[in-house]
Amino acid sequence: MARIGDGGDLLKCSFCGKSQKQVKKLIAGPGVYICDECIDLCNEIIEEELADADDVKLDELPKPAEIREFLEGYVIGQDTAKRTLAVAVYNHYKRIQAGEKGRDSRCEPVELTKSNILMLGPTGCGKTYLAQTLATMLNVPFAIADATALTEAGYVGEDVENILLKLIQAADYDVKRAETGIIYIDEVDKIARKSENPSITRDVSGEGVQQALLKILEGTQASVPPQGGRKHPHQEFIQIDTTNVLFIVAGAFAGLEKIIYERVGKRGLGFGAEVRSKAEIDTTDHFADVMPEDLIKFGLIPEFIGRLPVVASVTNLDKESLVKILSEPKNALVKQYIRLFEMDGVELEFTDDALEAIADQAIHRGTGARGLRAIMEEVLLPVMYDIPSRDDVAKVVVTKETVQDNVLPTIVPRKPSRSERRDKSA
């Protein structure tokens, strides 16, 4: 654009006026020039505006009742767990916002500490799905990790920092966004130490992993290898602060109910003690009476339990709940398969007793809600194989006999159209 200097051949930035000799790069456009410094400044302004736009105002943060209501649309039952999670998540993100806005000068400075969550309950009862649904609602990065793959640093297996890499990847390598995400660590009961007493031999996949997780659970500046795997001194690291990352750790904790019952039963010993029969102890929610001492006896170390102050337990799903899971949620399995059949121009129908039979099979197999899809696949496999090759099927009806006795679903033929009838008569 404008030229300066005696020779008239020295270009300058159209925005800041610096000459091409004063900057590293000068980029030409149709009638204008812009320098690298102005480009950097523009990028900084855009990033600041995007960051401001991403900040959720406190009055926009969903209230616990709204979080629970959202979960109701996807997860059947587990009311106590929903309430516990809703309050814990609300308080967690309220704490983050309080830190970003700074302390109110009218109040005494109070540091709000993080409350990670421990979820207990049998397999197939909705622990993972609850956490996934929460992350979807809040629109935050979410990562799932398997505790059984982790080992103490220096041994074969994954370092605990690889959990953080999954979160960073879920945030498209936006570290700032990842720092307010949710990490779900499953199968945490499998890293319990082998006995209640500390071992003199090194337990690299049990107690060693618990020790390694302590810092990132509490909040630390972690160095994460960008490609995963083991650390080595000649690679660059991604730095991430885990102070505002919410950790939800979960496990089935098979055998913990016996430890709880053993402790609760001891209350009946001695004069004047309250005697409780087995029938009086809540067996529908095995973990309703869990205490830190039970978890320590199970094999979790006290320091690990101390970093998981919120405990949410899920219960075994009964037949009624499994039937509701099949048909009521927004993405229920029955609705999914009806949609699949619609894409082939066929109507799919399940009778009420067919849904009950599917629920009975899931209970018999002990797989909970996770096993419902496998049963549906087994029941519908023959017709899903045949129907795409046929054009004479209008409707498929799945009955109780289809599920229990391996009878083929009832096929309702399609009535021929007028043109087809005309062609046949001709």
UniProtKB/Swiss-Prot annotation:
Keywords: ATP-binding, Chaperone, Metal-binding, Nucleotide-binding, Zinc. One of its GO terms (molecular function) is unfolded protein binding. GO terms for cellular component: HslUV protease complex. GO terms for biological process: cell division; proteolysis involved in protein catabolic process. ATP binds at P122, T123, G124, C125, G126, K127, T128, Y129. Residues 1-54 form the ClpX-type ZB domain. PANTHER family: ATP-DEPENDENT CLP PROTEASE ATP-BINDING SUBUNIT CLPX-LIKE, MITOCHONDRIAL, ATP-DEPENDENT CLP PROTEASE ATP-BINDING SUBUNIT CLPX-LIKE, MITOCHONDRIAL-RELATED. This is ATP-dependent Clp protease ATP-binding subunit ClpX. The lineage of its organism: Bacteria, Bacillati, Actinomycetota, Actinomycetes, Mycobacteriales.
